[in-house]
Amino acid sequence: MDKRLLTIQDVSCVGQCSLTVALPVISACGIETGILPSSVLSNHTAGFSGWTFHDLTDDMPKILDRWLTEKVTFDAFYTGYVSKAQIPHILDIMEKT
């Protein structure tokens, strides 16, 4: 049985970081990888004068409900940038999947 990893972190639309870097590296290792974006940023926060930010905390329970309905499970978890408010949701996801 193949193992499945869930990575939970932000998506920076510009900049070599976060999910845009983690996903291809993990996938290249042959690991099936699910993603749960914690937020979407217009660009990386380093080297830019500003950025836009969209928090996805409120979407986490809805995504978990869908995964539970579909009986999606994960064997490992890898987090990047997450907010303090997201930690209880992440623990819930880890427990239930």
Where are these regions (language model features)?
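Ribokinase/PfkB-type carbohydrate-kinase core domain
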Residues: D2-G15, L19-T97
